[in-house]
Swiss-Prot record:
MF GO annotations: ATP binding; kinase activity; magnesium ion binding; potassium ion binding; pyruvate kinase activity
Binding site for Mg(2+): E225, D252
PROSITE patterns: PYRUVATE_KINASE (PS00110)
Known partners and oligomeric status: Homotetramer.
Activity regulation (UniProt): Allosterically activated by AMP and by several sugar phosphates. Belongs to type II PK.
InterPro entries: Pyr_Knase (IPR001697), Pyrv/PenolPyrv_kinase-like_dom (IPR015813), Pyrv_kinase-like_dom_sf (IPR040442), Pyrv_Knase-like_insert_dom_sf (IPR011037), Pyrv_Knase_AS (IPR018209), Pyrv_Knase_brl (IPR015793), Pyrv_Knase_C (IPR015795), Pyrv_Knase_C_sf (IPR036918)
Listed name of the protein: Pyruvate kinase
Top EC class of this enzyme: transferase
Keywords annotated in UniProt: Allosteric enzyme, ATP-binding, Glycolysis, Kinase, Magnesium, Metal-binding, Nucleotide-binding, Potassium, Pyruvate, Transferase
Binding site for ATP: N38, F39, S40, H41, R77, K160
PANTHER family: PYRUVATE KINASE
Site entry (Transition state stabilizer), positions: K223
Classification lineage: Bacteria, Pseudomonadati, Pseudomonadota, Gammaproteobacteria, Enterobacterales
Species the sequence originates in: Buchnera aphidicola subsp. Schizaphis graminum (strain Sg)
């Protein structure tokens, strides 16, 4: 029987730290399952080099890891100050001026990069700058100038972000830079593309259309960052159904809805994504102290563990691996926490979709197989022989504590399944069909020391290998050799 394998996946962001020495290979060997290219930072050439190097390492290590391109989106920012920063006191009047030159900010006013901001605001609106560290109340709007009173002061430096409490800013989800980066993502051949600040399903549909037009079939991740996206259950479901996965980007989302609300929203988003057969990534400041320190705080350990207990498919590292001093150590620490949390019995039981009508034969096979896995004593693994990865995804929506092996001859499919909770991608190419192919798959997994004599496994497959959407069979087989 296979020893316990970590089920929750780890997304690691690439950057200057992973460019050094052999740090990129180290984070892969330490347990990174998805490599994120953050298009908010770095040049297109840097991203191309990182993607090329990552693929070379994957080939060398014979492993399957997903590449994720992350669009910057319409991050609304102040411009620059003459002296780089100012100090705002409580009750000061401070002006955000759309007409002010980019580098002429002073103690009284600063420019803004989103010129339509005055049109989106009303008197008494609260603006949150620098992730909420500075708070301003709108007291007057005159043409292009927003007059505010400082509620919470402090140091304000160049190019800090602006959010509106409760959301409602109308900036388009896809900027001109994003459209260029979609082409870059296609050239790099990413497996996933994350769309920042989508307000509704239409933003994601447009991104998918542009991606396909550029020649890519990458899957779309909706980054949940705006208050509008979580306004009610209907808004949440519309966003999730229009994407292939969601990323709970807790930084901007927490600023817009408040940290206290964020706790319940995180759980609701993960629960809804799983219910709708979608993938959920929990992100932002998960082990931020490890940017400078070799060990996480206990609060960070609990945060990661709770994301695992909530049912996240993956937990994400940002600056910790991109620019931190301890990139591989951070991945190792996160992996340990995930495995620890996964020992909790309550997360290995699921009633997912037991009371709903299945939408396809594939889903019926996947759900019945997982029901059998959870109720037949002695099952040690699930094997899904898959062309597109869809059956592997659906089986991974039910929590069982058992490893799910996704076997495919398509490397793109294997890369996609690297993000799914509990799924282990394995390259497999057979000219056999039916039980002969199933037995070949078992032999391969035995050779790789994943299965052992007398193990009991469930195999899902189609009658004919090599056809997408044809999974119609589930077998329970005993390993004998």
């Amino acid at each position: 029987m296979l020893n316990r394998v970590r089920r929750t996946k780890i997304v690691a962001t690439l950057g200057p730290s992973t460019d050094k020495a052999n740090n990129l290979e180290k984070i892969i060997l330490s347990g990174a399952n998805v490599l994120r290219l953050n298009f908010s930072h770095g040049s297109s050439e840097e991203h191309k080099k990182r993607a090329k190097k990552a693929k070379e390492i994957m080939f060398k290590l014979n492993c399957h890891i997903a590449l994720l391109g992350d669009l910057q989106g319409p991050k609304i920012r102040i411009s620059k100050f003459k002296k780089n920063s100012i100090f705002l006191k409580v009750n000061d009047v401070f002006i955000l001026d759309a007409n002010l030159n980019e580098k002429n900010g002073n103690n009284e006013r600063v420019g803004i990069d989103y010129k339509k901001l005055p049109n989106d605001l009303n008197v008494n609106d609260i603006l949150l700058l620098d992730d909420g560290r500075i708070q301003l109340k709108v007291i007057k709007i005159e043409k292009c100038a927003i007059f505010t009173k400082v509620i919470i002061g402090g140091i304000l430096s160049n190019n800090k972000g602006i959010n509106k409490l409760g959301g409602g800013l109308s900036a388009d989800a896809l900027t001109e830079k994003d459209k260029k980066d979609i082409i870059l993502a296609s050239e790099i051949d990413v497996d996933y593309l994350a769309v920042s600040f989508p307000r509704c399903a239409d933003d994601l549909i447009k991104a998918r259309e542009l991606l396909k037009k550029s020649g890519s079939n990458a899957q779309i991740i909706a980054k949940i960052e705006r208050a509008e996206a979580v306004f009610d259950q209907n808004a949440i479901e519309n966003i999730i159904l229009s994407s292939d996965a969601i990323m709970i980007a807790r930084g901007d989302l927490g600023v817009e809805i408040g940290d206290a609300e964020l706790v319940g929203i995180q759980k609701k988003l993960i629960r809804t994504a799983r219910k709708l057969n979608k993938v959920a990534i929990t992100a932002t400041q998960m082990m931020e102290s490890m940017i400078l320190n070799p060990l996480p705080t206990r609060a960070e350990v609990m945060d990661v563990a709770n994301a695992v207990l909530d049912g996240s498919d993956a937990v994400m590292l940002s600056a910790e691996t991109a620019s931190g001093k301890y990139p591989s150590e951070t991945v190792i620490s996160m992996a340990k926490v995930c495995k620890g949390a996964e020992k909790v019995p309550s997360i290995n039981v699921s009633r997912h979709r037991l009371n709903v009508e299945f939408q396809s034969i594939e889903e019926a096979i996947a759900m019945s197989s997982m029901y059998a896995a959870n109720h037949l004593k002695g099952i040690t693994a699930i094997i899904t022989m898959t062309e597109s990865g869809k059956t592997a995804l659906m089986t991974s929506r039910i929590t069982s504590g058992l490893p799910i092996f996704a076997l495919s001859k398509h490397k793109k499919t294997l890369n996609l399944t690297a993000l799914y909770r509990g799924v282990i991608p394995i390259y497999f190419d057979s000219d056999k069909d039916g039980v002969e192919a199933a037995n070949e798959a078992i032999i391969l997994l035995c050779k790789k020391k994943f299965l052992f004599n007398n193990d009991l496994v469930i195999v899902t497959q189609g009658d004919i290998m090599g056809k997408i959407g044809k999974t119609n069979t589930s077998r329970i087989l005993r390993v004998t050799y």
